Amino acid sequence: MKARNQVRFVITIVTIVFAGEVCFASGGDFEYWSTAGASLDINRDWGCTFEEELRFKDGGGELYYHHSDLGFVYKGLASWIDLGVNFRKVYSKNSAGEWVQEDRPHFNATLKGKVFGLDVSNRSRLEYRDRENEKDLWRYRNKLTVKLPVELTRLKLQPYVAEEAFFNLDDEGFNRNRLYSGFSVNVSKKVKGDIYYLWQTTESNGKWEDVSVIGTGLKFYF
């Protein structure tokens, strides 16, 4: 791993955190989610990732969620599987409008390959939710992503679809589902972008509630 890449990686993380805090300090019918991240190859088998995400509700005007996520990925087992361990710090508003914290370590196994010429990945995630003023719990998430083998316009937009199911490992069980449709784009050799529409349904008190989300993302590679 080159020292110059290490320095760039740290600078990128600091920039992402600073940008997130600026948005956090600023003060509807849909939500807007904004994600920025960085990925660093430590060596041939190991990588390090960092991510910041902000979520706005009430037409994209009120910040209600923010997380920072740091993780390590092992890619040396086989070309078709990545293993990861992460720690996520979450700040979100509760029903009273108060900010509460959550510590969320999570473990990931991502299977990837080609099926009928399509790029397909399936990520299994097991996370422990250590929540402030609420019961702690384990949750399992499974996300299936399919990328189409086409590139649209001069920007080389690649369309994809995805579905993610959430299962609380208690009496509640399956309680959330997300459907994605979007485009990924290579902004440059080391920067990738993402824009998507997400439809989320969540079970609450025996009723299913839905929300529409427009999301954008940027990821830097080192």
Question: What name fits each language-model region?
Answer:
Residues F50-E52, L83-V85, A109, N122-S124, ...:
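Membrane-embedded beta-strand positions of outer-membrane beta-barrel proteins
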Residues A36, L70, F107-A109, N142-V146, ...:
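Membrane-embedded beta-strands of outer-membrane beta-barrel proteins
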Residues E52-D58, G76, F87-K93, G113-V115, ...:
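Transmembrane beta-strands of outer-membrane beta-barrel pores
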Residues D45-F50, S79-L83, F116-V120, L152-L157, ...:
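Repeated loop/turn-to-beta-strand initiation elements of outer-membrane beta-barrel proteins
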Residues A25-K75, D82:
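Start-of-domain marker
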Residues I42-R44, Y74-A78, L111-G117, L144-L152, ...:
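Outer-membrane beta-barrel proteins
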Residues A109, D210-F222:
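Outer-membrane beta-barrel "beta-signal"
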Residues F30-Y32, Y64-H66, Q101-P105, D136-Y140, ...:
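Residues that define the transmembrane beta-barrel architecture of outer-membrane proteins
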